[in-house]
From Swiss-Prot:
Binds 2 manganese ions per subunit. Substrate binds at residues 144-148, 155-157, 198, 261, 292. This is Arginase. Pathway: Nitrogen metabolism; urea cycle; L-ornithine and urea from L-arginine: step 1/1. It catalyses: L-arginine + H2O = urea + L-ornithine. It comes from Schizosaccharomyces pombe (strain 972 / ATCC 24843). Mn(2+) 2 binds at residues 142, 144, 247, 249. SUPFAM superfamilies: Arginase/deacetylase (SSF52768). GO terms for biological process: arginine catabolic process to ornithine; arginine catabolic process to proline via ornithine; urea cycle. Keywords: Arginine metabolism, Hydrolase, Manganese, Metal-binding, Urea cycle. The keyword Metal-binding applies. The gene is car1. Gene3D superfamilies: Ureohydrolase domain.
Length: 323
């Protein structure tokens, strides 16, 4: 059996504190403009074709698939800050659409399952969630902090910058992103899985006292204790909605081989699933992002392994259990 194949076991819907029904919207986000490698835009269609909607229906959910949105095409002329960051107008146009779509689906009392695509899309997903749940906390699972500003980013790729917009660190805002705003405070954000940070990201995490658990912490304390500490910090008493943003590169390359910025020494499959199980147990999940699957960065088997991992992440945070 594939390590990610859905087993013939008991399944049940996550008991939600915030949603009236048992409905989810899978929002496909075929976009790779926040980084230089082609392929991430193919992931949503592949994950859907592999059976994600059917997975969630078997769990008991009413599933709506927001078919690939008609994202605005790459502009013929980029914005005035092209020298400061790559594809700023293109990324801005798409993430603004993403914000609106996520907000609309949440307002329909549907859990937003956001399938990317690269992680620059979180500029929009975080704003969309906060527009409906302005006290939501964000659990960011990633090898990277994605907290660079356009000024501090060594690569100038915007998939490494989404949280700088959400936290207000990118101010004064580039003209292309004048629509964004600070929507979360540091006390409502926690990282798990970090192991590759740029110098300015280290400074932000230390100086702003942002809760961040590296792979050293996972090794030292174990994943159960790390998740418990992270949730207690950002969601004391479990009174806040949770937005889980999961970059598959948080996992070890053996677990997630088809992704763009692989870093050795990541989460095991079970550690990744434990995070998702813990989120499901809170009953507080309102949105989940699964980002940076890139089927072109690996052979057929590696692409399938990573696509199946994405399905497992979604199923598990929405309540799949063994018993």
């Amino acid at each position: 059996m594939s390590p990610h194949k859905i087993p013939e076991v008991h399944r049940h819907i996550m008991s939600s504190r915030y949603m009236e029904g048992n409905a989810v919207s899978i929002i496909n986000m075929p976009f790779s403009g926040g980084q230089p490698k082609d392929g991430a835009e193919l992931a949503p269609e592949m994950i859907e074709a592999a059976g994600l909607p059917e997975d969630l229906e078997r769990l008991g959910y009413s599933v709506n698939v927001v078919q690939n949105p008609k994202f605005k095409s790459r502009p013929l002329k980029e914005g005035p800050n092209q020298a400061l960051m790559k594809n700023p107008l293109y990324v801005s146009n798409v993430t603004r659409q993403v914000r609106n779509i996520v907000q609309q689906e949440l307002e329909k009392q549907r859990i937003a399952v956001n399938i990317g695509g690269d992680h620059s899309l979180a500029i929009g997903t975080v704003e969309g969630v906060q527009a409906v749940y302005d006290d939501a906390c964000v659990l960011w699972i990633d090898a990277h902090a994605d907290i660079n500003t356009p000024d501090s980013s060594p690569s100038k790729n915007l998939h490494g910058c989404p949280l700088s917009f959400s936290l207000g660190y990118a101010e004064p805002l580039p003209e292309e992103f004048a629509w964004t705003r600070r929507v979360i405070e540091e006390r409502r954000l926690a990282f798990i899985g970090l192991r590759d940070l740029d110098p300015m990201e280290r400074a932000f995490l230390r100086e702003r006292s942002i809760t961040a658990y590296t792979m050293h912490d996972v090794d030292k304390y174990g994943i159960a204790r790390v998740v418990e500490m992270a949730l207690e910090h950002i969601n004391p008493g479990r009174r806040r909605p949770i937005h889980l943003s999961f970059d598959v590169d948080a996992c070890d390359p053996i677990v997630a081989p088809a992704t763009g910025t692989r870093v050795p020494g990541g989460l095991t499959f079970r550690e990744a699933m434990y995070i998702c199980e813990s989120v499901a147990e809170t009953g507080s999940l309102v949105a989940v992002d699964v980002m940076e699957v890139n089927p072109l960065l690996g052979n057929k088997e590696e692409a399938k392994t990573t696509v199946d991992l994405a399905r497992s992440i979604v199923r598990t945070c929405l309540g799949q259990t063994l018993l």
